[in-house]
């Protein structure tokens, strides 16, 4: 009969240990999430400071259609701003130039029917 209480105690200890592990993992995830949110907020602040309204609209349009290209452009603008190579704000024409540099020329295909 002495085995039954020890099994209950073991089960209780297991539950406590599992709860502790879950709390630790949850705490780390929250810390990473908070850091990501802070980094995203800083990136948005830099973009808002260095892009005109037209350039920001164009960037948002690109992000909607091609998210990877939009992220590349954002990273490029942030890098340029942090290195001090941006004079004034980037307008829509400069944004078009950045887009044309980072996106390869689209290939056209001619389909001929016989």
From Swiss-Prot:
It holds the Pfam family dsDNA_bind. GO terms for molecular function: DNA binding. Residues 1-45 are annotated as: Disordered. It comes from the Archaea. Residues 32-45 have a biased composition (Low complexity). Residues 1-11 have a biased composition (Acidic residues). GO terms for cellular component: cytosol. Transmembrane segments: none annotated. SUPFAM superfamilies: Double-stranded DNA-binding domain (SSF46950). Keywords: DNA-binding. Residues 12-22 have a biased composition (Basic and acidic residues). The keyword DNA-binding applies. Belongs to the PDCD5 family. This is DNA-binding protein rrnAC3180.
């Amino acid at each position: 009969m002495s085995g039954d209480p020890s099994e209950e105690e073991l089960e209780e200890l297991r539950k406590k240990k599992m709860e502790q592990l879950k709390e630790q993992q949850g705490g780390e995830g929250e810390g990473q999430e908070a850091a990501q949110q802070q980094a995203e907020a800083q990136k948005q602040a830099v973009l808002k400071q260095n892009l005109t309204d037209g350039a920001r609209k164009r960037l948002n349009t690109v992000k909607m259609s091609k998210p990877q290209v939009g992220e590349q452009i954002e990273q490029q603008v942030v890098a340029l701003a942090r290195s001090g190579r941006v004079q004034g704000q980037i307008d829509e024409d400069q944004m078009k130039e950045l887009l044309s540099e980072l996106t390869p020329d689209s290939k056209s295909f001619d389909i001929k029917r016989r």
